[in-house]
Amino acid sequence: MSRVFSRRLMLRGLGGAAIAAPFLASVAEREAKTQGMPVPAAPKRLIVFYTYNGCLTNRWFPALSHGPLSRDDYAAMRTLAPMAPYADKLLMVRGIRAMNEWSFEGTLGQKNDPYTQVCGSYFTCQPVTPNATQSSAANDGKFDARPTGRSLDHVCAEQVNAGGAAPLFIQIGGVQGSFTLTQSVISWLSPDTIFAGIGAPRTLLTNLTGLFGPGPASPDAYQALRRKTVIDCVRDDLNRLRSVPMSQADQRSLSAWADLLHETSGTAINQCNSANAAALGLTDEAVQPGGDLSTVAPMMMDLAVLAALCDANRVIFMKVPFDFDARFLGVSGDTLTITHRTGSGVMNGQCVRNSIDAIQTIDSWYAQQFAHLVGRLDSFVEGDRTLLDNSATVWFQQMSDGVATNLNNLPILQAGSCGDYFKTGWAINVENANPNMTAGNSDMDCPNGQVQVADLDNFGTPPDVATQPINKYYCNLMNAIGVKAGADGFPVLGGTEQVSRYGKYDDTTLFPTDAPAIIKNPGEYMDLRAS
């Protein structure tokens, strides 16, 4: 039997991650120890959970907008109480505005659509095209506009993933989006290329483990795979390499590497194994088609944790469906129309009875899912920390209030310091450190049982409050995981500088214009840094 390393086979799924990443890191660690150098740091990751249609902001935000937030503070919150156990590892980022807000007047962004342009610009910070000239149901680009640049996940992945591999993009509940319907699309490989990602748990598990094909692996085949060590997999390659003339130093390095593989690899996997997969509930029997979001969402999050555990991807984005039937939560209707309070797609009219309570139920469920993800990441040790500690795990929301559709005062909650890059245990108001910033007025959206379009700005957050550009926070995240920039501060492959600029504009009023690209407020938010 050939003992030649098949790169195509090994890199097909978990094999590449399990062998290449952990053992290369171990070799570096061993080499560092023998030479008295610092042990290489654990990988840094960006993990994103994205939800649509905003929230009840005055129930989501705490009263304190700048200062320490304790476990008791979170426990007292209406929506974020499930996050209380992780309070000392949380960073609530306040004062942020996302780019390209929709309105009838087009004063804070383009006029295409409250969802299409927001999703297209959210992680790109680029305008969408075509640029609608009016706000109407029949305007150009209402449902199919595309951003003029690629999204953050791809910008990061090409630098921090091995070989510039694509990010892991998980569409919880199934793949959504097409070139004729881009309302919910957030991941763009390029302006003309939607990145669909993965929408089926079984597909993701198969991609990760390489053990599961159309059907389960037989017990004999599985045990055979488990018995193979790394040396078994690459024995012929190793022998061929040993026959190549090399210096004594290289011979010693090669012998040390082989010894290390024998020491560390009773199997070809370390934490990246079936035991940990099973501990996450990721067995072949459990990961089957079907089920509603109550089971699919935590399963997909567990798969994201397994991917992080295996170092299979250092940029992991996941999203819930743009609009879904919420009956499994005991709520009648779909999430989009519930968010509008009217029971339909219109933004004014008679409020549906108990619509505010229904929104709260959905908001609380999202918080429970994020708490599940954070708890799983925090349960696995990585060096002297946990997976969570070595990551920046961020819950982003498409908008602030779901009927006002405002993008200022954006709800953002980060878990994990990403290797002590970020300050945690705090709410930090990057606008002015004001501890009493408004939490918004979402509970006022149905006064006298009506939603009035003329009052939408008042129901959300006044447009001149919490307006600092999200671009700068993206610079924080990129710098934290090791993305580099060129001399101009924009992220670029092969760069050597800190990232200080991202996107076309950081002024949302410029998005409907044809103004030259300009970043008015470069740099990251230093207040978010641990030191």
Where do the PLM segments sit?
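Ligand-binding pockets and gating/stacking loops
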Residues: M1-S531
